């Protein structure tokens, strides 16, 4: 007999398809269950969650995408009313889930898993367990990162035959495993509004080879979640390129040093007829971007080249890395700096350059200094924005204009006469000269699109990732037709409550642009931008919230953002700059602005409950700053002491006066909040603390100004 249900999971298990490991990179699963309902049911709800993202269907209808971002210690699941989606008789529930298995600055993946429970008239009618049918999805798993914040690049292979359904594997009971404190989502679901796309350009594209990306971090650490560490883990890939004749081919690359036959290349592959030993060296630590380096040959003749693994194994490349890098595998995600280990790793990376020539690979396999991988293939990376036209081509490019920037989910309908490949990407801006602002150029690094492989016939596909841009560019090969394209905008459901109008049309337009920009930066938290990062930066949140209060309200979004940031105190002694994030970096003035934002939320909303809910975190955040006060009474810490992208932000100073000044501002806000919480004892402590900071800071007030920092305790900085 079904168990009577509360508003949390009671019977459901975390499930997945059978895997050799459940922390592998970029894994997809489809799960479904049939269940029967009798006539006359009144109300139905579903509880659902996944690590890392999911899409829910009921009786073939897409219901929602989720979940919101969260820390694994404080999981937020979704609870939806699905009464209108169910029917008497047989029903089907289907969930597609994607476990990222990699570092990101918007999510913290820890273990593949999905969970669901359906409650009809307060009784459980279905829940995830081993009775569910599951199979691996048709998304390719061997893809590069889309960016450091948004997980793996999406590449769907509709040509794959669908796997047979298997029995699900039960991983954990609902409230066990690596996910803790399961509570319902604390902000509304995003909108689903259709946006019109207008075809504005069609052009032919040249034949060209793939863009090859190297998963160096995954090759070194094997278990990809270890790649969430900001630790050195570079290496070198080797291949033999067989050229049909002497040729020079221009190339682009990111991070890699490239040597051919022992000679370092700068912008051109200089190949001799026959065999050429090629080394791709990544001689720097991994970090936000450096563990996914790539290269691209920009010439149609690249298709004539053959690749052969010099080790004799299958796969295009072999790989080596310093064995010292492997010592990072069991370190915590944000370890103390180990100077000795870093030195050994960096020395090993430097020595890789001497191997940039034909070498006896048997020596490498026997090396005590290096680890050798005899064979690997680069990741699938079809995201190649074309930057020139060509008359003789095997592909056509179509560019669509949304009119203004948007963010959401793209759907395509493709009609192909034979097997074909489709590549889609989005951009924000095109200059008057027609130059496109691509999202991969210089140090900018975001594959803002997806790849799709389709068989002959009609294929319909809806991307699983939210993307942003104004222009949508689709490239298709062969006799292939784009039968349909749609953009479903997905943002926070704003309610217009403020307006602005004056006699200056320029100012009116500025208001409209600002309001639209804010709307695109409101989702399950405030975000820094809709395209590149979609990160929840605490300092940005404070400023965005102030604008939102007058324009849209958005109090619930601010409340959620404040709470999510407060939960970072499980990982650091001050509120972090960006949450949730695979490493816990602190920008002190943003830790302080969180306190200011809490006060401002109360002043605008009048909701004292949010203050009380976050009061313990507020006091912890303030009290822990005392451990960073030096003998001179100033805030002194080795953090990212940023203010506003000035020169001082990058100088590595421990003592910068704006930190102490902003801490004083946070104490001011805290004193005001003490009236709400009736915590007079803490108010007195904050008053005394603030007075001591004022005394310490004012020692450096000279000639009508404060210096940015103190070079030492006896003299002011020359930077003001």
Question: Which positions does each model-derived feature cover?
Answer:
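Extracellular/oxidizing-compartment recognition motifs
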Residues: 2-528, 540, 556-559, 575-580, ...
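Short, well-ordered beta-strand elements
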Residues: 279, 664-667
